[in-house]
UniProtKB/Swiss-Prot annotation:
Belongs to the KAE1 / TsaD family. It is found in: Cytoplasm. This is tRNA N6-adenosine threonylcarbamoyltransferase. Substrate binds at L129, V130, S131, G132, G133, D162, G175, N268. GO terms for molecular function: iron ion binding; N(6)-L-threonylcarbamoyladenine synthase activity. InterPro entries: ATPase_NBD, Gcp-like_dom, KAE1/TsaD, Peptidase_M22_CS, TsaD. The gene is tsaD. Gene3D superfamilies: 3.30.420.40. It catalyses: L-threonylcarbamoyladenylate + adenosine(37) in tRNA = N(6)-L-threonylcarbamoyladenosine(37) in tRNA + AMP + H(+). One of its GO terms (biological process) is tRNA threonylcarbamoyladenosine modification.
């Protein structure tokens, strides 16, 4: 089995996966959402302290399987430095103590494996990545080579939801809160402009939309629940229109045979519905990760670890480092 550890941001998670059939033998996740919600976002120092408390307890839960673990896979890039260190330190110690290989996993590439938790990797593949501070469209060819097609020039899809939620004192994380509030809102009440609508560049930008929302909110002395619902609905509609508007242009050029949406943002049901329409229009096979595994989790890290284990992609424990920022363009997906 492969042991996966994930601690790139504000979730501590551990997973055990069978190398041969990808069966998830054990999975547990400890979220820090309640602790960070009062601050309207993730506080790095608090995240580090909570990881330090949670990870030893998670490892204790899989102690009975130690003799069956063939390698430990851990997220070592990208993410919050203080959070990455917590997971990598634990993984390094386990590798040395158990005498098993250590595997470093790129967190964003890990999300790609969330599409294939219980099956073999399918290539070629187009990907919409909407995870935390990242919004990207990727093309992965038959060899696993990853090409970046589009990214954001400022705020990400997820960050814009978090910031709009904070503007209305709704709590953190903003994605699920805005989506739920939007259900009872009127998406046509506020006519927010879709960013870069007539710009031919394959690029995303959410800061302008965020500022449109802030300007609208400033016009109110106080916001009623209905006002908040209408703002949430109008904002969500415009943000997703921005995603799909650029995707239509990308699909026209790339003709994806398979397409997957990954990351916490891909759990949004309105976005999923829009992606279904696009993929039906262009004849692309659409894939999603199970809702439980859209957000950060160790199952996807273990799944990536299985592929890297089979390809003998190991790192010496004392040589493993963390990388808070990294590029996906030119990276490879193992299968």
């Amino acid at each position: 089995m492969i042991l996966g550890i994930e601690s790139s941001c504000d979730d501590s998670s551990i997973a055990l996966m069978d190398i041969d059939n990808f069966e998830l033998k054990k999975y547990k996740k400890i979220t820090q959402e309640n602790e960070h919600s009062k601050f309207g976002g993730v506080v790095p120092e608090l995240a580090a302290r909570l990881h330090t408390a949670a990870i030893p307890n998670l490892i204790e839960d899989v102690k009975e399987f130690f003799t069956s673990i063939k390698a430990v896979a851990v997220t070592n890039e990208p993410g919050l430095s203080v959070s990455l260190i917590s997971g990598v330190s634990a993984a390094r110690a386990l590798s040395l103590a158990l005498g098993i290989p250590l595997i470093g996993v790129n967190h964003l590439i890990g999300h790609i494996y969330s599409l294939f938790l219980d099956k073999n990797v399918v290539l070629p593949l187009g990907v919409l990545l909407v995870s935390g501070g990242h919004t990207m469209v990727l093309n992965i060819d038959e060899s696993g080579y990853i090409k970046l097609i589009a990214t954001t020039s400022d705020d990400s899809f997820g960050e814009s939801f978090d910031k709009v939620a904070k503007m209305m004192d709704l709590g953190y994380p903003g994605g699920a809160i805005i989506e739920k509030l939007a259900l009872s809102g009127d998406k046509n009440r506020f006519n927010f402009t879709v960013p870069l609508k007539h710009d031919k560049r394959l690029e995303y930008s959410f800061s302008g939309l965020k500022n449109q929302v802030r300007t609208q909110i400033s016009k109110f002395e106080s916001l009623s629940l209905q006002d908040k619902s209408d703002i949430a609905s109008s904002f969500q509609y415009t943000a997703i229109s921005h995603i799909t508007d650029k995707l239509e242009k990308i699909f026209s050029e790339y003709k994806f045979k398979n397409f997957g949406a990954i990351g916490g943002g891909s759990a949004n049901q309105v976005l999923r519905s829009n992606l279904e329409q696009i993929c039906e229009k262009f004849g692309s096979n659409l894939m999603f990760a199970p809702l439980k595994f859209c957000s950060d989790n160790a199952a996807m890290i273990a799944r990536a670890g299985v592929c890297k284990y089979k390809n003998k992609c190991f790192t010496k424990p004392l040589d493993m480092s963390i990388n808070p920022r990294c590029k996906l363009d030119g990276a490879n997906l193992y299968f």
